Each structure stands twice: as C-alpha cells, then as structure tokens.
C-alpha cells in the first residue's frame, strides 16, 4: 500500500528533491532495568480460623479478573514506537515475558499450600510484578534526499530525552 519506488533517470542533470518523512524515534538506549515484584496488588484471600481447633490449609485463588497496565512515565512523541523499543530492550535484558498489558483471570489458582494455625486470621496477598525500565530515546527529523541519480536518507535536528516505563510481567 505505502510502497514507493524511484527509478533511475539516464540523464538526471540538475535533478534535486528533499522529501520530509517525519519526526521519528530513532534509537533507545537502556540505562537501568529493575524488577519490582510488588508492582500492583491484584488479590487478597482471607480466612478466619479463630473458632477452630485445627489448622486450615489455605490456597491462592484469584477472585476477580484483574487487568494490570504498564506505561511510559512521561509524555513523549511517537509513544507507541518508544514503547516497542523499550519492551524489546527490557525483554532482552531480563529474559522475562513482558507486555504493557497483562490479564490475570478470575479463578486462577496456585497449588502452594499455606497452613493457618488455629485461633488466627489469615490474609494471602497477591501482587503483579513489573519491570522498571529507564533509558534515553533519540529523536530526529528524517528526510529523503534525491540528487541526480543518488538517493540518501538524511537525519537532522537530533535530540535525546530521558524516559522511563513500567512493564508488567505476564
């Protein structure tokens, strides 16, 4: 759909064109990647064992579906492109399955057992984990320059900006 071709002209004397393609996010350089194992609380299981004389075996069960959102910590141009670059770099560094949106479904269970002693109240908290990614994104204005039979990309007005993101672990 958006494909363009430029054919060579045999006599392209005096032929010159500069086409502005846009202001793009060109590069992302990671400075720090750190996991946060308690990024967002997603569930609480509760049991009151005060009236019992026997221990209660407590399991984790997700009570409601929970959507965990990540995102950039600042507004930047071309945010979707920056998110993709940061996601790729963070996944490469951590070797974890990352996504800017993670869903924990209702009824999700874990087989691990927690014994609740008699005459006690028990709370079991569940948290979604996330990775905090910080770095620097580079922007530039991209031009297609045609001069005679020569074609080239030229990048002008290059700027850098610090950026951070929270990326939930799936």
Kindly label every feature range from the protein language model.
Residues 6, 19, 42, 103, ...:
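Weak global preference for isoleucine
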Residues 54-110, 136, 140, 149-150, ...:
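Membrane-insertion modules used to breach or fuse lipid bilayers
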Residues 10, 35, 77, 97, ...:
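Proline-rich intrinsically disordered, low-complexity coils
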Residues 1-71, 99-103, 107-113, 146:
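Deployable pore-forming modules of oligomeric membrane-permeabilizing proteins
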Residues 105-129, 135-137:
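Tight coil/turn sites that cap or link beta-strands
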Residues 129-130, 143:
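Short, surface-exposed interaction patches in beta-rich subdomains
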């Amino acid at each position: 759909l958006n494909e363009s071709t430029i054919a060579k002209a045999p006599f392209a004397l005096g032929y010159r064109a500069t086409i502005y393609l846009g202001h793009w996010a060109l590069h992302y350089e990671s400075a720090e990647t750190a996991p946060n194992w308690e990024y967002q609380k997603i569930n609480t299981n509760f049991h009151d064992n005060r009236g019992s004389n026997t221990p209660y075996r407590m399991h984790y069960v997700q009570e409601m579906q929970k959507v965990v959102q990540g995102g950039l910590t600042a507004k930047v141009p071309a945010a979707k492109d920056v998110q993709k670059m940061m996601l790729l770099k963070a996944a490469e560094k951590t070797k974890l399955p990352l996504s800017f949106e993670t869903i924990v479904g209702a009824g999700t269970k874990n087989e691990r057992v927690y014994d609740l002693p008699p005459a006690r109240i028990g709370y079991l908290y569940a948290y979604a984990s996330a990775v905090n990614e910080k770095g620097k994104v580079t922007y530039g204005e991209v031009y297609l320059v045609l001069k005679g039979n020569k074609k080239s990309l030229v990048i002008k007005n290059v700027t850098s900006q610090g950026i951070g993101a929270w990326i939930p672990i799936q």
